[in-house]
Amino acid sequence: MPAPSPTRQPATAARDWFLAPAGRAVLASEEALVVQALGDRPGLPWLWCGPAAGEDLAGDYGRGVRLVPAEAGWAGQLACALPLPLPSESFGAVVLQHVARPAGAFGPALLEEASRLLVPGGRLWLFVLNPLAPYRWRWRGSGITTSEPLVWRRRLRAVGLVPDPVSQGLGPNWSVRVSAQPQQGPGLRAAYLLRAEKRSVPLTPVRRRALQLAPAA
């Protein structure tokens, strides 16, 4: 695969890869779990940030906001950059589908936004490519950077989220085909899903001081 043009931003180059057959096979393999995420907290809106190839799903699953990566930040139902113009603790689920990165505009600040927007008990659904998969040769030169689950768990904890101990492997191993059946652990699958929950912080009980009586006059 040819390297992306130097004039293209990394977000745009990665987005273009997911519009090609190899990327679309990964997205199609994740479709059932994205649908599950959108219905994870009935009655609460969701936020779905990801490549445009699957946007036709969004209108069928309750109230939500659909954003796609763009050169200047985000496009879709809103044209904006971080911080997102959305109220804190108002979303039951946040789906980050192949948009989170180790650094830059889609790095830690994006995870912090996800944590801010989730209600206590809400969940982040993080879909990322697997750096150990043979399929990585298909995104070579696209500008996509990937990390193993252990690294992502550290990043999620750093923004106050509690990640699941086990991720789910998704997508093909090497052939460009849809492979939707998840497996425990990423293995050699093209991508994996890591979920993390926002826990409510318990109030620290205040120790009552013993009543001090003044001595009688």
Predicted regions and their residues:
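Class I SAM-dependent methyltransferase Rossmann-like catalytic core
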Residues: 1-40
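Class I SAM-dependent methyltransferase SAM/SAH-binding core
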Residues: 32, 36-84
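A short acidic, Gly/Pro-enriched loop at the edge of an enzyme's catalytic core
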Residues: 78, 82-96
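A short SAM/SAH-binding and catalytic strip from SAM-dependent methyltransferases
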Residues: 92-108
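A short glycine-rich, Lys/Arg-flanked "PGG" loop and its adjoining helix->strand segment in the class I
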Residues: 107-123
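Conserved class I S-adenosyl-L-methionine
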Residues: 123-150
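Short alpha-helix
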Residues: 143-170
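C-terminal lobe and adjacent flexible extensions of AdoMet/dcAdoMet transferase-like proteins
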Residues: 159, 179-217
